[in-house]
Amino acid sequence: MPSIFINIILAFIIALLGMLIFRSHLMSSLLCLESMMLSMFILSTLTILSLHLTMSFMMPILLLVFAACEAAVGLALLVTVSNTYGLDYIQNLNLLQC
């Protein structure tokens, strides 16, 4: 396995660990999700190009589309929560709070 694949997988694992560590803040969680999607995009693109899989050239583009939708929804949620509560804590998203 080339070192570029190991570096991309390591970047994904670091972003996943960041997601687990900074799970209380919405902005940090969104940044970790974006870095996870970026590493998945790069890994899928490199895999498709190195294996010459001509039938799945559209998969990285679909992954980018889903990442853009996720970013738009996440930023809208961040703006709504910060305007309502003044904080970006994820615990403010719980509708069952007393």
Curated annotation (Swiss-Prot):
Q: Does the keyword Translocase apply?
A: yes
What would be one Pfam family of this protein? Oxidored_q2
Query: What PANTHER family does its record include?
Result: NADH-UBIQUINONE OXIDOREDUCTASE CHAIN 4L (PTHR11434:SF0), NADH-UBIQUINONE OXIDOREDUCTASE SUBUNIT ND4L (PTHR11434)
Q: Does the keyword Transmembrane helix apply?
A: yes
Cell location: Mitochondrion inner membrane
Reactions catalysed? a ubiquinone + NADH + 5 H(+)(in) = a ubiquinol + NAD(+) + 4 H(+)(out)
Keywords on record: Electron transport, Membrane, Mitochondrion, Mitochondrion inner membrane, NAD, Respiratory chain, Translocase, Transmembrane, Transmembrane helix, Transport, Ubiquinone
Lineage, please?
Eukaryota, Metazoa, Chordata, Craniata, Vertebrata
- The encoding gene: MT-ND4L
Q: Which organism is it from?
A: Varecia variegata variegata (Black and white ruffed lemur)
Concerning InterPro entries, the annotation shows: NADH_UbQ_OxRdtase_chain4L/K (IPR001133), NUOK/Mnh_C1-like (IPR039428)
Name by which UniProt lists this protein: NADH-ubiquinone oxidoreductase chain 4L
Entry EC number(s): 7.1.1.2
List, alphabetically, the Gene3D superfamilies matched.
1.10.287.3510
Per the UniProt entry, what are the Gene Ontology biological process annotations, in alphabetical order?
ATP synthesis coupled electron transport
What's its top-level EC category? translocase
Q: Which GO terms describe its molecular function?
A: NADH dehydrogenase (ubiquinone) activity
